[in-house]
Amino acid sequence: MPPASMRRDAIYAQFDTILVGRRTFEPMVRAGRATMPGMKTFVFSSTLRQQDYPDVTVVGENAEQTVAALRAASGKDIWLFGGGELFRRLLEAGLVDAMEVAIIPVLLGGGISLLPPPSKQTTLQLTGHRIYATGIAALEYTVST
């Protein structure tokens, strides 16, 4: 298995735009990683102010229209990197084509839902998978329409 840095670089190379919600973005800022190298960062929040975060684009309204415009523009794939509420909104608007889920072999007994309620049922089609020596299973799906 290639080193983690090589796998991470390969993942990052697919994308030129990253979308995050406020609750995902704030820990990124605290960790000194408000942006990802080579990617435009869009933060979806009704409370953050653009002038406080000049290195990213803060989207306060019209999330669906913003993402539709990003999808229509030329470029690489768009990465929704955390933000369950944002994921639900974009999924319900038909703006999610595919998703990748990593199953980590640790039972937490609680946590944040992948798709918070209320949400409609969505059918997925498995398109790929990888099993790592660590026990992590990476599953790739397309969203059925």
Residue spans for each PLM region:
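Enzymes that bind and transform nitrogen-containing heteroaromatic metabolites
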Residues: 1-145
